[in-house]
């Protein structure tokens, strides 16, 4: 299995407030992307960790190429930056026949323990598994959910974590059959998209 950190988005919800690219925003003198890569690198299940910036995030690209240049199991591949879904599908095709664990660079509280728990609980009944949380749980932490899913009259939000079996993807243009893994955990609920989210993450970090 390959871990893929998607960090090539424009980060438009944060870009209006700062010139610093979202993956390079800092909590306790450490960038968001470093928290994520560090957690993934501690997981023995991954053959390698691939960081994917794009032309939208040139500073991030330069930063990760420099800081991880001597790490044998960490690779940097630049995407075209044409949008999350398209970039993701190109990576799925590129890394066949591997399974991919995809996530953004905006989950500062993720850790190796929760990553292992996610993988251990995956039932491979669909080529795509998305990790979701109850909307009310995310809101109870103080985060405003972005991607909302309604299932059986209950509202959920996407954690930003997706596991894909590339062998189940026959065509880059196909609509993937998706199953959901419910996991109400703070470690994956704090998804930093705005400066307010960043401030909340900083305050939660000081409480822990």
Residue ranges of model-derived segments:
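Conserved N-terminal catalytic core of the sugar/cofactor nucleotidyltransferase
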Residues: 32-99, 112-113, 151, 156
